[in-house]
Amino acid sequence: MTQDELKKAVGWAALEYVKPGTIVGVGTGSTAAHFIDALASIKGQIEGAVSSSDASTAKLKSYGIQVFDCNEVDELDIYVDGADEINSQMQMIKGGGAALTREKIIAAIARKFICIADASKQVDVLGKFPLPVEVIPMARSYVARELVKLGGLPEYRQNVLTDNGNVILDVHNLTILDAIALENKINNIAGVVTVGLFANRGADVALIGTADGVKTVELK
């Protein structure tokens, strides 16, 4: 199976977790796009969705799925999204698609976080994939200097603004052994909106696409 076929398999497998009559949290990226395709097949059974990006919102609306503002929703039953990396503790690096802040907000209000990913995203130690940090533009240089102090090599993501109007620093050269501590440390730097470490709020279930089919991993 190609990587895209693996992504499609996990996107459709996530339908099993969608309960009728609920509002579904939907992520961003190529794997989440397959989940939106799948969700469209049962759109008459759900109330609608909350979306983590303008791109996902447009795709949901193109299928006629109602998209709710996050402020209209107290709690979501599930949030389904991909990951750039996921470890055995269900901690993730996310934000390759620059939607990390909205993704983190939706994850916070969801009872269950379903991570959908192909097997290439599974790692023993987080950090090979550059860690995205969303930063208020005027703080870019200061935050970059602080990230260097933490051992990182931050790179300004050129010509990219988040849906919130901020910039992204991608931090290379990290071996993340304590993801919760690093998430807290980076989030405390003035000017950081959020870091793409999902460790304090990791995944509850991971659906991993492999050549042998979709494997389900649950947080122990």
From Swiss-Prot:
Residue numbers annotated as active site: E103
Signal peptide stretch: none
Bilayer-spanning residue ranges: none
EC number of the protein: 5.3.1.6
Gene Ontology process terms (BP): D-ribose metabolic process; pentose-phosphate shunt, non-oxidative branch
Gene Ontology CC terms, in alphabetical order: cytosol
Binding site for substrate: T28, G29, S30, T31, D81, G82, A83, D84, K94, G95, G96, G97, K121
Keywords: Isomerase
Reaction equation(s) it catalyzes: aldehydo-D-ribose 5-phosphate = D-ribulose 5-phosphate
Claim: Isomerase is one of the keywords in the record: yes
CDD domains, sorted: RPI_A (cd01398)
Entry's Gene Ontology molecular function annotations: ribose-5-phosphate isomerase activity
Pathway terms, separated by semicolons: Carbohydrate degradation; pentose phosphate pathway; D-ribose 5-phosphate from D-ribulose 5-phosphate (non-oxidative stage): step 1/1
Family annotation (Pfam families): Rib_5-P_isom_A
InterPro entries assigned to the protein according to its UniProt record, in alphabetical order: NagB/RpiA_transferase-like, Ribose5P_isomerase_typA_subgr, Ribose5P_isomerase_type_A
HAMAP family xref list: Rib_5P_isom_A
Sequence similarity: Belongs to the ribose 5-phosphate isomerase family.
Quaternary structure and interacting proteins, as annotated: Homodimer.
Protein task: Catalyzes the reversible conversion of ribose-5-phosphate to ribulose 5-phosphate.
Name recorded for this polypeptide: Ribose-5-phosphate isomerase A
Source organism: Yersinia enterocolitica serotype O:8 / biotype 1B (strain NCTC 13174 / 8081)
